UniProtKB/Swiss-Prot annotation:
The keyword ATP-binding applies. This is Adenylate-forming reductase stbB. Signal peptide: none annotated. It comes from Stachybotrys bisbyi (Hyalostachybotrys bisbyi). Nonribosomal peptide synthase-like protein; part of the cluster that mediates the biosynthesis of LL-Z1272-beta, also known as ilicicolin B, a prenylated aryl-aldehyde produced by several fungi and that serves as a key pathway intermediate for many fungal meroterpenoids. The first step in the pathway is performed by the non-reducing polyketide synthase stbA that produces orsellinic acid by condensing acetyl-CoA with 3 malonyl-CoA units. The prenyltransferase stbC then prenylates orsenilic acid into grifolic acid. Finally, grifolic acid is reduced to ilicicolin B by the NRPS-like protein stbB. Pfam families: AMP-binding, AMP-binding_C_3, NAD_binding_4, PP-binding. Residues 564-651 form the Carrier domain. AMP binds at residues 251, 344-345, 349, 423-426. It catalyses: ilicicolinate B + AH2 + ATP = ilicicolin B + A + AMP + diphosphate. GO terms for molecular function: ATP binding; oxidoreductase activity.
Length: 1057
């Protein structure tokens, strides 16, 4: 084996690599097994890698050692596994793959290259994949064998048994030491077999699976050779300096480090695999090996900004490269200011690394990646955004084959306009339904376009109650073949629906539009779908879809409603058409359908069936059924009895819906289902007040963004870890700048983005990063919550899973101190208490679900979370300090006037301006500026002493609505005013115009039945506890006229008013 301490520069003989030619050229190296052989012969004594070991020791391996280990491992594989040709139908590999489930170290590299040398494609699995994802990948690739490392074999025993039962051979891999033969002549191992076709698939990686199950990503010999040829150094000294890499080897970027070791001689140093690397251990590793560069994940670098020694060590390196996720701009700026030469890596698993690995010099800007020039690519112009030009990258790495268009939108560095770019967003669209729920169409579109009979699929449904999809057949259909084509693709659509949220499911084949023969789906010059143009082309067809869905529900056999037997008729419709699995005898007239699991899509379908049956009724022939049974009908009348009453007496629809007497059952059920399991007798020290590391959710919202800013400005806070959804747009300052929040560079540097999947195991966080959180976080502020007043309680289960996942994180890890957990609840959770008690003030205490639950999903969902937290505060009292904060009406910022235009109050004023009429809202209001609200969260997070389990965030000083409307009328130039009910009728009757002129209509049921009581003083929150724990609330007064004026000026500035 090689020597770690050798500092003498050895000449490295670079192989004549060819990834461009489709056919093998004489003397060229066209595959990784050939490259291993080349280096074993020409660079035998040059170090391939250095593997860290527990206790600070190292193993050093030359290229000759690597060849010997791979050859011996290949021999072991042939003796212990049933290797052979793929038997799977539609196989993408000639030979059946072998899965590798191993920790990221030299042992994984040895097994991977041993399989490559045998022509057996390794399927390299991430160690954080759950069992169902692993089984999916094994089946979809036709893998016949599964190798697990010794370290992981214990936890994997149940899974191994399941694999064996499915006919997959399993084996525990040997440690890499068993494959070494010190002193053996490398020539005795012969040479590996040379692949005939450079385009054969030789390696299988996989996607992250953030939008469903992970999919296998096939990599050919040429693609691999392209991937490892990404380095460009000016001197041998730059090329051969040791390179520490903590990038996981089972990800695409993990191949870069061993790749450049084989192509330019840059020896890789791997951390010990006995634990999760942290920045302290990485810095120590760099110092002990005299490494010259570092490749790592952004999260590790987030931890170095307050480590003076770490900054000094990293500043002495040739470069520090990051890939796989975005480095927070504030962190990057601070590292660059410390003299660290940051290098931005860019690429996709499918394309391979598209950026150069080099030593940054001169005025290279770390925020941009430097594009490789050894491939074919084109840069196309896109529509500018916010005055900044945007671009699209299309590559054809090898000069032939199909173009590969990268989904990211790019901006360019004007100093290096041909090569330096940054990714600023993706094309992935989210469709907002009429309920306010957000539907992500990617799973549906991807599964359809992957089908052999489909050329393109485009989902639609903006401001509708469900999605539809436009499908372009791959081949022209026979005359009259549309119905048969829909039948053919319908199982795919159903399968996609099983992986999507209930509200995203395609309801029937009526919602499928088949592109006619001769009609071309609009595309950009580079072949991507031009979504806006598609919607314009098929506007009439999409309109017909929703009209058909409304008309054709139930078919000709649907019986008309009979007012004499109305409850029985409605019950029969529910049993037959809703999709609920409930027997007729089990459905009482008084129980809420949502207690039986009715989801938003089923509610929509049931409303359509009821409307269709009502339209057939002789007794209702002169009635406007759409007004009697509006889109929100089932939400407002969730039981059979309530529906019957509302249909028999339509005038009662002007009154608020009655409270569902059984709503508390759903709250208690979910509170029990998602409670933090177990109990802990451990008693830790009180939570810390200094050097805090705070996890925050909901940072894209108004309160969340201000909480993050307030924390970042406080010297007690060392780091703010912002949880963002996986697949969301790149992290930048936009959530703060759009609200007028200015952060200094050192403040912004504290903010660290962390992509999560709220419903996945360990929140979908990489094990290394999750381990760091377990051992370092001190506080959690959970502010994420969807603003949707029509969603049912069962639809909030993913939020309960999110809370459960955060509580599990908060109670894990080895820390000496308790952790504080602050949850942002709502006035809605307890509003019923005041409404049913003549406006009595609500005290800051826990409430009973039987008294507070109201049947509105948004409100009852918050109540479920309160009950989950109350249980955790008792069962884990020695580990957690828990508080929830019920928030009243928050306004925009006191400092800047920035107030989100999509909130209730701005909606009222925009609608009023376009109507030319103001509403007269009775009573008083209690408004608290969002920056004051954020300061209260801060006060509570670091309060000296025991936390109150419940407190209220509301302005203790109330103001008159009449005074506010007088001022608003003068600003808007509106003199006319009518009562609140009359104004709502005007808004509801207004014709929809362009640009969302009457936004109140979007949430009409909420404004009609819920807004008034909570906004006008019928629901008043006590604030004694809050005032006792916060000077911010204690000293708060009424909002002055100048502050209120700032809000109107802000809405005017952004062209909302």
């Amino acid at each position: 084996m090689g020597s770690l301490g050798s500092s003498q520069l050895k000449p490295f003989n670079k192989a004549p690599i060819d990834f461009v030619s489709t056919k093998r050229q004489p003397g060229a190296v066209c595959s990784l097994p050939e490259l291993v052989d080349y280096n074993a012969q020409h660079n035998a004594s040059h170090n391939f890698c250095i593997q860290g070991k527990p206790g600070g020791e190292f193993d050093t391996f030359t290229h000759a050692d690597f060849k010997v280990a791979a050859a011996n491992c290949a021999k072991w594989l042939k003796a212990n596994l049933p290797l052979g040709a793929s038997q799977a139908p539609n196989a993408i590999t000639k030979n059946a793959p072998v899965a590798l489930f191993m920790e990221s170290d030299f042992g994984l590299v040895v097994h991977e290259f041993a399989l490559l040398s045998l022509g057996i494609p390794p399927l390299v699995l991430s160690v954080r994949l759950p069992p169902n994802a692993i089984m999916h990948l094994l089946k979809s690739t036709g893998a016949t064998s599964f190798i697990v490392s010794q370290k992981l074999s214990g936890p994997a025993k149940p899974a191994l048994a399941a694999l064996a039962a499915n006919g997959i051979a399993t084996a525990v891999g040997n440690p890499y030491t068993s494959f070494l033969e010190p002193g053996v002549d490398v020539a005795s191992k012969g040479t590996f077999e040379v692949p005939e076709n450079p385009d054969d698939i030789t390696l299988l990686l996989h996607s992250s699976g953030t939008t469903g199950l992970p999919k296998p990503i096939p990599i050919s010999h040429r693609m691999l050779m392209f991937a490892v040829s990404t380095a460009k150094f000016d001197t041998e000294d730059e090329a051969q300096g040791l390179n520490v890499s903590s990038l996981p080897l089972f990800h695409g970027f993990g191949l870069v480090a061993p790749g450049i070791s084989m192509t330019v001689g840059k020896t890789t140093v791997y951390p010990a695999s006995d634990g999760i690397p942290n920045i302290v251990s990485i810095i120590d590793l760099i110092k002990r090996t005299n490494a010259r560069s570092l490749m790592t994940v952004p999260f590790l670098l987030d931890d170095v900004i307050n480590n003076e020694e770490g900054l000094r060590v990293l500043a002495g390196l040739d470069f520090v490269g990051t890939g796989g996720a975005a480095l927070g701009p504030g962190v990057g700026d601070k590292l660059a200011a410390a003299g660290i030469k940051l290098l931005n890596f860019y690429g996709t698993t499918e394309s391979g690394p598209l950026s150069l690995v080099f030593v940054p010099k001169d005025n290279y800007n770390w925020k941009f990646f430097r594009l490789r020039t050894d491939m074919n690519f084109e840069i196309a112009n896109l529509e500018p955004k916010d005055g900044v030009k945007r671009y699209r990258l299309t590559i054809r790495a090898f000069g032939e084959g199909e173009d590969q268009e990268i989904a990211d939108q790019l901006i360019r560095n004007d100093e290096y306009p041909e090569t330096d770019f940054a990714a600023v967003g993706r094309d992935d669209d989210v469709i907002v339904l009429a309920t306010g729920e957000k539907a992500s169409p990617q799973i549906l579109e991807n599964m359809l376009t992957e089908a052999p009979m489909v050329k393109a699929a485009i989902a639609f449904g903006e401001n509708q109650f469900n999605l539809g999809v436009i499908v372009e057949p791959k081949e022209p259909l026979a005359e009259g073949g549309e119905a048969a084509f829909k039948e053919l693709i319908w199982p795919i659509i159903v399968a996609a629906g099983q992986k999507m949220d209930a509200h995203s499911v395609i309801p029937s084949q009526e919602a499928v539009i088949v592109v006619p023969n001769g009609v071309r789906v609009p595309r950009t010059d580079k072949g991507s779908i031009a979504r806006k143009e598609v919607y314009a082309l098929f506007a009439d067809a999409m309109k017909d879809v929703y009209e058909k869905l409304a008309r054709a529900v139930g078919g000709a056999d649907l019986k008309p409603l009979d007012l004499e037997t109305l409850e029985e008729d409605i019950k029969a419709l529910i049993i037959e058409h809703s999709g609920l699995k409930v027997p007729a005898e089990g459905l009482s007239a008084e129980e809420s359908l949502f207690d039986f699991g009715l989801d938003s899509l089923q509610a929509l379908k049931l409303r359509r069936v009821l409307a269709a049956a009502a339209n057939k009724s002789e007794a209702m022939k002169d009635v406007n059924v759409d007004k009697v049974i509006p889109p929100e009908f089932v939400y407002l009348n969730p039981s059979v009895a309530q529906m019957a009453a509302a249909i028999k007496n339509p005038s009662a629809g002007s009154a608020a819906p009655t409270v569902d007497a059984n709503a508390y059952k759903g709250v208690e059920k979910f509170a029990e289902q998602y409670a933090l399991p177990g109990a802990s007798a451990e008693e830790k020290a009180p939570s810390v007040r200094e050097r805090a590391i705070v996890v925050v959710t909901g940072s894209s919202g108004s309160l969340g963004s201000h909480v993050v800013a307030t924390l970042a400005r406080d010297p007690k806070v060392m780091r703010v870890v912002v949880m963002v959804r996986q697949g969301s747009k790149p992290f930048d300052r936009e959530p703060w700048t759009s609200r007028g929040i200015n952060l200094k560079e050192d403040e912004f540097a504290k903010i660290v983005p962390l992509p999560v999947d709220p419903t996945a195991e360990n929140l979908g966080v990489d094990p290394m990063m999750y381990g760091m959180l377990q051992n370092n976080l001190t506080h959690i502020v959970h502010a994420a919550w969807p603003m949707n007043y029509l969603t049912t309680l069962p639809s909030f289960q993913y939020q309960f899973e999110y809370l459960s996942g955060l509580l599990k994180l908060a109670t894990s890890g080895n820390t000496a101190n308790k952790r504080r957990f602050i949850f942002v609840s709502s006035i809605a959770a307890v509003a019923r208490l005041s409404l049913s008690n003549s406006g009595a003030m609500i005290s800051e205490t826990p409430v009973e679900p039987v008294d507070a639950a109201c049947g509105i999903g948004y409100a009852d969902g918050k109540l479920v979370c309160e009950k989950i937290l109350e249980k955790a505060a008792v069962s884990h009292a020695g580990q957690l300090e828990i508080a929830y904060v019920r928030c009243g009406q928050m306004t925009g910022s006191r400092a800047t006037g920035a107030w989100n235009a999509d909130e209730q109050i701005p909606m009222i004023f925009r609608t009023a301006k376009n109507l030319g009429v103001l509403p007269r809202i009775p009573g008083t209001l209690s408004w608290i500026p969002v920056d004051d609200a954020a300061q209260y969260i801060m006060d509570l997070s670091f309060f000296e002493g025991a936390l109150p389990i419940a407190s209220h965030l509301e302005n203790p000083v109330r103001q008159s609505w009449a005074d506010l409307m007088d001022g608003a009328g003068k600003f808007l130039g509106i003199q006319k005013s009518v009562s609140w009910p009359e104004w709502l009728e005007l808004a509801g009757a207004a014709e929809d115009g362009p640009q969302d002129k009457y936004p109140v209509k979007k949430l009409f049921a909420f404004f009609k039945f819920s807004f008034g009581p909570m906004a006008s003083g019928a629901v008043i929150l006590g604030t004694d506890v809050a005032r006792a724990h916060s000077a911010t609330i204690k000293n708060m007064g009424a909002l002055d006229a100048s502050t209120i004026m700032k809000y109107f000026l802000h809405w005017q500035k952004i062209n909302y008013l």
